[in-house]
Amino acid sequence: MQLIDEVDTDQEDGPLGKRRISSTMHMATMFAALGGLLFGFHTGGISSAMVAIKQKIQLDHFWQELLVSITVGVAALSSLVGGALADCFGRKFVIRCAGFIFLLGSILFIGATDKTSLLISRIIIGLATGLTCSSVPLYIAECSPAHSRGFLVSMNSVFITGGNFISNFLCAAFGSYSGNGWRYYQVTSIATELYCLYAFAFACVPALLQVIFFHFLPESPLWYLDHGRVLDARDALKRLRPNLLDANKEYELIKARNDRDEQMFLEKGRPSIWTMLKSLHYIGIFMLGMSMFMFQQICGINAVLYYSATIIQMAGVETVGISLWLAAASSGLYFICTIVSLLLVERFRRRLLMLGSLLMVFISLIIIASGFHLIANSSPEITIHDETTQSTVCGGFLTCESCVNSQRCGFCYENRVDKNGSCLPTTDDTFQYSAVGKCSQEDNTFGPAIWAPEWCPSEYAWIPIVGLLAYLISFAPGLGMMPWVVNAELYPRWLRSIGVSLATTANFLFNLIVTLPFLSTVDLLGKSGTFYLFTFFTLCALVTFFLFLPETSGRHLLSPEEIQWRLYSFQQKPFNSSSHSSNSNFRYMKIRAHNRQFYNEDEESSE
């Protein structure tokens, strides 16, 4: 029995100030999550930027997919080394390095004037993204108290969606400036413009704040323990916990479990990645962590976010400005839903949130796919056949849908009830005009005609948009947050960094697999077919997690062996520490005035 003396008359906080979070812990979470904000800003915002960029710089589907996905591909590679760097040099070091690289990437974007310079800046941003995503959730989880870990780790998701919303909003707001609005929100080129300076300040200030102020925040206490710096671990806990009693109690807990594990390692040898491959339990942990991010991506979230403005245009919204504002509104809704989800993450079990989210996402995707199916079936016919296009590929199409599915053609129509229109070839240097006919730049009759290079007018355009909004609302509390939270809780200490790193790599790899060929997949399967495919993957995820997903809430990070699998066969563990746990049940006596209260640590941590 270990005795901890305290005189405390504050009865409302419960045992050991159970529900309080220190100001330092809040600051550590916020400044770490700035990396998530920059991640969301630079990746999600490309959705709206792409609509404006392709108006100024001729970009076919390949270049659009490349500029969107190159950041994700580089992030997948850098996240592989992010875990090793975080283990070697510390979580703080990697997070600050990522902030500096984000700053460099933003500055390089300033001079972007063509495809190549845009591509280089996106590669630099991808490097920072991978380092951020492999270290920030790890740092927040290891610094957080068990009772608020889900809430605090979820702040990273809030900042990611917040960055996404801000970038979409700025792109919509500046999108009308001579076709160069995409420059101003990401800071490029004409630095003499006042609004460009404001945008530059926003893009770079979060990175600067993270690099500077993160220096004064504590390192992860568990990282200190892993490197034998026990006094530093104790000092870090004193700064991160609301009072000395909480810090001392948690220090004794993690020190005892650390000593127990070290004794076990001395007797059985230190575990390695090969240890994981010999046990169904650790294989199950590893596969579950990866599958959560895999399904997060193949259910379509980043395809929807990255191409939201394009999807809204595909639904039949006529003007670029309206589609940009609708994309900003959809990302704003997702941001709000993520904030609301913070209220749910510690009130409901992780498993319940995940399964409920998947069910609603499944229904939402059916609505989107059905809407696009109705739009395709009601596509306007080609009623005006331009003599100059009869010998071209555009002259052979009979409906608007078949016309716009070809990258070389677009639909030119009069904005009337009957939607009389023709299929005309696009130009080589811009999507704004057709090469010939009423929608060409030279034709004097361009005014009353509308040029639709990638979409068709339809009375059903509202259905996919409603489904898109329902999808974002449904996705946020489960698939949006839970993969980050559960991955931070699944792994034992010796597997945590590599586990989070590999799971993050899986996240980016499947992100790349989905987003890189997204527009090409739409060309191949059609809009409705693409979203029916996402619907099928969501159903697979629902079945998989119903069968295999365990509950991880309320567990201490040093006791992942407490996880109860849905299938008993996964309970086998090669490193069962029960034989070394004679000292694992510590009882703490808290003296409060004249009363004595006894607390069993294992009971408290399982609440």
Task: Please state what every model-predicted region is.
Residues P242-K249, I563:
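Short arginine-rich
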Residues Q2-K238, E262-N415, N420-E607:
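Transmembrane-helix signature of 12-pass secondary carriers
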Residues A247-E262:
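Short, well-structured alpha-helical segments
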